[in-house]
A protein has these predicted regions:
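Residue signature of alpha-solenoid helical repeat architecture, marking inter-repeat boundaries
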Residues: 5, 45, 131, 170, ...
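Amphipathic alpha-helical segments of tetratricopeptide repeats
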Residues: 32-39, 72-83, 119-127, 157-165, ...
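Structural motif corresponding to the intra-repeat A-B loop/turn of tetratricopeptide repeats
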Residues: 21, 41, 61, 109, ...
Length: 988
């Protein structure tokens, strides 16, 4: 191993690389080594670079307490030899002054007197250097705010805003974060959010903004009821700060938000992702933040009954929520006590106590992301359906409760069972004796409630049957016996159970024939028998007999609903046979019958089935209409799983017609209710897939990526390949939009691996192309070339000339990268692209396909233009005195010839004018200024008057760009740009 001292250039290169490394101890260690190596060279400017790099590394890490040593050395070097500092390093030194007081405040071991002294030192040095006092007042404000001195803070804040901004002022984004945070402290949430708006909108950004603003905005948004924005800020913001070691305070804001919005499970996952945050002591202030929100979260878990649950905490110990609560509160209090002792007041510990004591802001704010384990009990539906009873009964008035229950039963309302149960409980509490009919109803409805547990349900049905018999209601008694046999038959699926059901049905049929049972009772029993039996050839005929019977008795009491039930079952059987067109009409008729019967809540079932079927048939309008109707009519009758399914179907239908904002809302609801129904892996993953796609199309890539990343494990485990491919495709696009091309390429390639086995290869080819594009953006030219080759082979096999031509051109450009073949291979790829386009153009022309021919003509022309660009860009020099061998002139002449070929092939429009301007620049570089000017004036004449109005991306925007470039060509060629009046006079 060589011990040779690295050269200065090697160290400079290493410093550049070190600045781009992830924050943390590893980067700091390299920065420390580079200082030693730079010092050994004796090169003072290089040593200054290394020291500044070390200061930055410490400042943006968990070792902020080490910041002061290299800074003190820099300051000493400045005081001793200011001439060693050039303008940039002098600026950097004064810039870092601002950090010192803030870093001192965060270290309780540094006396307050030293901090105040440093603040005066900063003011003195800034004055000597001629800088504005804006940064000084900002430092004064930070000290006062930390100390809880409101009057001093308000005065410093006002002075800060009044002072001029200069080169030493904090960046706009950081300033606005501090100003908004103060407004939150003062209880002015809306004002804070207005202050932060330019940062949130991307007008002002920096290395740590909008990261901090997104975290700080969470609780103000929730307090103001702006829950959708809060959710979006969490999904977007946590993604930004998760990999950054220095953002412990912002991460704490996300944990706090989750703890106070019913997302405790999500908060636990965030804690688990940052175990070092419990032990990194270099920044006591953010350590206290982390401990405080950990304590807050543990308090919530204990309050929810999860005190003995295992939770992530400091390494080396198995923690329960209760134990971590005690630890976090104790350690946070110890840190705050150190601050209080330093500051001479209890401002820090008071803020800590207030933070720990915070209560939930909302019961549950669905985030759309998958929590690996739920902690809270399932929530009730948000909007229960109105009960049929006009006036709620007194809970101890048995007579009123019975009347309410009868009214609900007469209305066939789904709340009838609960009403009978309430009446029964009230009778027991008050010792009220009930008659046989009421006791029968109570037992009957209790059996229905326990239907899936035959051991409980059957005795209740038997009791109800006896009571109905005693009350002189033989039809109801027989119907109860059918229900008992039905419950057993469904659970056991045995011949004996089916025989018992047959016997009960026969008994009920005899009663109906004798006029002692209703058609409704018989129809219900008949349908039950058909549902229990194994599918058979006679089912269709039997169903038609039931429907005919129900139609015959349709005018009898409550028979419209029974007819609807029969038609719904018929529709299910029809769908199973594959006749989806017929069953759609049957579901629609069943829903209408329920509405005619005045029982819209029962229409929810056929409406839901119709919605599902319509979505499968790509009938998105019917799917949307039916899902909305089912959600409206289902009300309390819908459980979490059915509610989740309907919201997701509705979301998918809305997304299919481009209503992505509303689709995202319903997909979010679908994911939430799937979680409540313990269906996260199945239904929840589908909802999150729909949500991720809708968010992506809405331009919310960070939220989309976060949602899709949490959905993918479930999709891979429990869903078909089509959904997995779609999820990875959308995730790849989201990551691409977030400028994470390497990660995007990984998703595209994983999706392509699945799609390669499909019979239809279109998706495989597109995914290979997308992967290649992302690999190229990531600087992985070799891998990109392989992916483009893969895509090209697929396009060729599918006889798709347009994407094949584009893939060949992309491969050609890659050849200019080191190790990728160079210009000769690039020319060959462009020539192949031109040949493919020419052959396809000839075929389209011969076939009389004008649209295809026009498209291919544009691709051929574009290939010629790009060939010229490739040749010119690969040329190391330009025509002129330095072009001693004439190679540059030859390359530019060839590039011009390619551009002229493109101009002759392109039709009128932006593509041809772009080629014309390319030719103009080349003419100018070749010294043919008159020819260049002539081309430029032709473009000006073409676009004269078209650059007014419209947006930047429209025709007016293109016209403005072309006119501006043409005038630049004229200036470059040494001519005055022609104004409108000269163009009109014929000078163009």
């Amino acid at each position: 191993m060589s011990n040779q001292q690295p050269t200065a250039e090697t160290i400079r290169r290493a410093l550049r690389q070190n600045r781009d490394e992830p924050e943390g101890r590893a980067r700091n260690a390299v920065a420390e080594r580079l200082v030693a190596e730079a010092e050994a060279t004796g090169d003072t400017p290089l040593l200054l670079q290394a020291l500044f790099n070390l200061v930055n590394a410490y400042a943006y890490s968990s070792e902020r307490d080490k910041f002061f040593v290299p800074f003190a050395r820099l300051l000493r070097m400045w005081d001793e030899r200011p001439g060693d500092f050039d303008g940039e390093s002098a600026h950097h030194l004064h810039w870092i002054f601002k950090w010192v007081a803030g870093n001192m405040l965060d270290q309780p071991g540094i006396p307050l007197a030293s901090i105040e002294k440093w603040q005066r030192e900063m003011e003195h040095r800034y004055r000597l250097a001629g800088h504005s006092e804006r940064a000084v007042h900002q430092g004064e404000f930070r000290i006062a705010r930390h100390l809880g001195d409101t009057a001093r803070a308000e005065a410093a804040h006002a002075a800060w805003l009044a002072a001029d901004r200069d080169a030493m002022a904090d960046c706009h984004a950081c300033e606005l974060h501090g100003q908004g945070s103060w407004q939150v402290d003062r209880g002015r949430d809306e004002e804070a959010l207005r202050t932060w708006e330019p940062v949130l909108a991307g007008q002002y950004t920096c290395a740590h903004e909008p990261h901090n603003v997104l975290a700080s905005s969470l609780l103000p948004l929730v307090r103001l009821g702006r829950l959708d924005e809060a959710r979006a800020h969490h999904l977007r913001g946590y993604r930004l700060v998760r990999p950054m070691e220095s953002m412990r305070g912002a991460v704490a804001g996300h944990v706090e938000f989750c703890a106070l919005t019913g997302n405790e499970a999500r908060a636990l996952e965030i804690l688990a992702e940052h175990p070092a945050y419990f032990t990194d002591t270099g920044d006591p202030d953010t350590l206290m933040d982390h401990l405080a929100v950990t304590g807050l979260l543990m308090r919530r878990l204990v309050a929810l009954g999860h005190g003995d649950r295992s939770v992530p905490g400091p390494a080396g110990t198995d923690w329960t929520a209760r134990a971590l609560l005690a630890h976090a509160e104790r350690e946070a209090a110890a840190v705050s006590a150190r601050f209080d002792a330093r500051n001479g007041n209890d401002a820090v510990s008071r803020r800590l106590r207030e933070r720990l004591a915070a209560g939930p802001l909302v019961e549950r704010l669905p985030l759309g992301v998958r929590a690996r384990q739920r902690l809270t009990a399932p929530a009730a539906p948000a909007q229960p359906a109105p009960a049929a009873a006009a006036v709620p009964a007194d809970r101890e008035d048995v007579g009123a409760l019975l009347a309410e229950a009868r009214a609900l039963s007469d209305a066939q309302h789904p709340d009838a069972g609960a009403a009978w149960a309430a009446a029964g409980r009230a009778a027991e509490r008050t010792g009220t004796a009930l008659g046989d009919p009421d006791r029968a109803e109570i037992a009957d409805h209790a059996g229905i409630a326990a239907f899936t547990d035959p051991g409980t349900a059957v005795p209740l049905f038997d009791t109800a049957a006896e009571l109905y018999e005693a009350a002189g209601k033989p039809g109801e008694a027989a119907a109860c016996r059918v229900r008992a046999a039905y419950a057993k038959a469904l659970a056991e699926r045995t011949g004996r159970a089916s025989a018992a059901l047959d016997a009960a049905l026969d008994a009920l049929r005899e009663l109906h024939d004798a006029g002692r049972a209703t058609a409704r009772q018989l129809t219900g029993a008949w349908l039950a028998r058909l549902e229990v039996g194994p599918p058979g050839a006679g089912d269709e005929a039997e169903l038609l007999r039931i429907i005919a019977f129900a139609e015959e008795h349709r005018d009898e009491e409550r028979m419209a609903g029974r007819l609807a039930d029969a038609i719904t079952l018929h529709a299910r059987h029809t769908a199973a046979r594959g006749d989806v067109g017929a069953c759609a009409g049957l579901f629609a008729r069943a829903a209408r019958l329920h509405h005619e019967a005045g029982t819209p809540w029962y229409a929810a079932e056929p409406e839901a089935l119709l919605a599902d079927l319509s979505l499968q048939r790509d009938d998105h309008a019917t799917a949307e209409e039916s899902a909305r109707a089912a959600l409206e009519h289902g009300a309390t009758a819908l459980g979490p799983v059915h509610r989740a399914h309907l919201h997701t179907v509705l979301a998918a239908a809305l997304a299919a017609r481009g209503a992505d904002a509303e689709a995202a809302d319903h997909a979010l609801e679908g994911a939430h209710w799937a979680d409540e129904g313990d269906m996260s892996e199945e239904l929840g993953a589908w909802a999150r897939l729909v949500l991720g796609g809708a968010l992506l199309r809405e331009g919310r890539a960070a939220e989309s990526a976060t949602v899709l990343e949490t959905a993918l494990p479930d999709l891979v485990r429990a869903h078909h390949d089509g959904r997995v491919v779609q999820a990875r495709w959308w995730l790849g696009e989201a990551l691409r939009d977030l400028d994470e091309p390497r990660a995007a390429a990984e998703q595209f390639l994983l999706a392509a691996e699945i799609a390669q086995d499909w019979e239809e290869q279109q998706d495989h080819a597109v995914l290979a192309n997308l992967a290649a594009d992302s690999l190229e953006r990531a600087g992985l030219a070799g891998e990109a070339a392989q992916a483009y080759c893969r895509a090209g082979e697929l396009w060729r096999a599918m006889e798709r000339p347009v994407p094949l031509v584009r893939t060949l051109r992309a491969r050609a450009w890659l050849t200019l990268h080191d190790g990728q073949g160079g210009l000769a291979e690039g020319r060959a790829a462009m020539a192949e692209a031109a040949a493919v386009a020419e052959e396809a153009l000839a075929a389209a022309t011969a076939a009389g396909d004008g649209a295809a021919a026009a498209h291919l003509r544009a691709e051929l022309a574009g290939t010629h233009r790009q060939t010229g660009e490739l040749i010119v860009r690969s040329c190391p020099g330009e025509p002129g005195e330095d072009d001693t061998d004439g190679s540059a002139r030859a390359a530019y002449e060839e590039g011009l010839a390619c551009a002229e070929r493109a101009i002759t092939i392109f039709g009128p429009g932006p593509a041809r004018s772009a080629a014309q301007l390319m030719a103009a620049w080349l003419e100018a570089d070749l010294g043919r200024h008159a020819a260049a000017a002539e081309r430029a004036r032709a473009v000006i004449a073409e676009y004269h008057g078209q650059d007014e109005g419209g947006d930047e991306g429209g025709d007016a925007g293109v016209a403005a760009q072309r006119l501006a470039e043409a005038r630049s060509v004229l200036e470059y060629a040494g001519e005055r740009p022609a104004g409108p009046e000269r163009a009109e006079a014929g000078e163009a």
